[in-house]
UniProtKB/Swiss-Prot annotation:
SUPFAM superfamilies: CinA-like, Molybdenum cofactor biosynthesis proteins. This is CinA-like protein. Belongs to the CinA family. It comes from the Bacteria.
């Protein structure tokens, strides 16, 4: 079984929205062994929808459509499918009950103008919408299209995702004879080309059916090890062997396999070793604290964060010496060190991380260009003294990109420091 995804909506073609629905659907289908061979974005024009769906149904077993099921005039997907398949609609009692309940739960009456949201194309299987109002459906398209299946879902991500999890994936699971396994390998502190050179031998020795994809992004490089085959046990074995080989070769740069984030990894290391952390931020403006506290359970290890953006704030809130600021400038390792010391002593945490830099687009100089970042790490030692580590880094990007990269670098330095303090830990998956 192979699939195509058709995303309907003028906003996708005008750049108004990013098509996150397609990536979610593709990943979900991959999990049940259904590869996606094409993703198409289509306007709200009824004739265009018919043309695109006719082409997709003629070359694949399964077409999943998002968008165009709402109650407004520009929602034309249902009408287009009715014309394409030459079928009418019927009211679904179950869909109508869910729609009425949705309005009742909000203290409202169901408007007559929205009853159409409870209609489905004849011969289709209802895909209930427990989050919104538009009913989804699974349609067998008959011999004209080789008995291919068509799935219609709303374009609202939360509604589509709920439908995929509860109805669509269970419906098609087991219909594919192909086993597919994708394993993300998360790296930090190494570039794409350097990583490729490091694991060249492992890539040359990939078993049949296994591929390796490099996905560079703002903060680092993710690898995705993908294995395809007919026997699930063999697919899992081959995939695991490749992942283990990469871990053995490049483990010092790998913080997780799977969907674990760097902040989750740092948090797990802190929690498992009964350690606490505090942060002092300038250029990241609270982003580092935000990422650390995005992790559920972070109250067990996160003590506090101080945003000391101005020089006066660095002096007043953290005790940074004015002479240090005057001698080295705010963006310097000596200031980063004093910021880390200040928040460590004031918070009572075991570890402190500081950031001071130039996010841009202005404010740079010849020796400190835009994208310069200084990080300070301070950690309590068993004898009561404080160990320090500082570093200067150079980034390139927009202000928003630099702030994101600065926070990632700070988390990376915290991760590296923790590995030295508590020893290498099992890679999170």
């Amino acid at each position: 079984m192979i699939a195509e995804i058709v995303s309907i909506g003028d906003e996708l073609l005008k750049g108004g929205k990013v098509n996150t629905n397609a990536s979610f659907i593709a990943a979900a289908l991959g999990g049940i062994g259904v590869p996606v061979i094409r993703i198409v974005a289509c306007s709200d024009d009824e004739d265009q929808i018919i043309t695109v769906l006719s082409e997709s149904l003629s070359r694949t077993d399964l077409v999943l459509v998002t968008g165009g099921l709402g109650p407004t005039r520009d929602d034309r997907t249902k009408k287009a499918v009715m014309r394409l398949l030459q079928r009418s609609v019927v009211e679904s009692e179950e869909a109508f009950h869910m729609l009425a309940s949705w309005f009742t739960a909000r203290g409202r009456m169901l408007p007559d103008t929205l009853r159409d949201q409870a209609t489905i194309i004849e011969g289709s299987v209802l895909v209930p919408n427990s989050v919104g109002t538009a009913a989804g459906m699974i349609i067998s398209c008959g011999e004209r299209f080789g008995n291919s299946s068509l799935v219609l879902m709303p374009g609202v991500p939360s509604e589509m995702q709920e439908m995929m999890r509860k109805t669509v994936i269970p419906f098609f699971a087991g219909q594919s004879t192909t086993a597919i396994l994708h394993t993300p390998v998360k790296t930090v502190g190494i570039g794409e080309s350097a990583l490729a050179d490091l694991i060249a031998a492992e890539e040359d020795a990939l078993p049949e059916g296994t591929t390796l994809a490099y996905l560079p992004h703002t903060a680092g490089v993710d690898l995705v090890v993908s294995t395809v085959g007919s026997i699930t046990e063999v697919v899992e074995r081959d995939n695991r062997r490749v992942v283990d080989a990469i871990l053995s070769r490049a483990g010092r740069f790998i913080y997780a396999t799977g969907d674990t984030t760097l902040e989750e990894t740092v948090g797990r290391m802190l929690a498992e070793n009964s350690l606490s952390i505090a942060v002092a931020e300038s250029c990241t403006g609270g982003l580092l604290a935000s990422r650390l506290t995005d992790v559920p359970g972070s109250s067990a290890y996160f003590q506090q964060g101080i945003i000391s953006y101005s020089n006066d704030a660095k002096v007043q809130l953290l005790g940074v010496d004015r002479m240090t600021l005057e001698a080295f400038g705010a963006v310097s390792e000596p200031v980063a060190k004093e910021m880390a010391r200040g928040v460590l002593e004031r918070s009572g945490a075991d570890i402190a991380v500081s950031t001071t830099g130039i996010a841009g687009p202005s404010g740079g100089s010849g020796d400190k260009p835009v994208g310069t970042l200084c990080i300070g790490i301070a950690g309590k030692k068993s004898d009561g003294s404080i160990a320090f580590r500082t570093g200067t880094f150079r980034m390139a990007g927009t202000r928003a990109q630099n702030k994101q990269r600065f926070s990632e670098a700070a988390l990376r330095e915290a991760w590296t420091y923790l590995q030295e303090v508590v020893g290498p830990v099992r890679v999170a998956g």
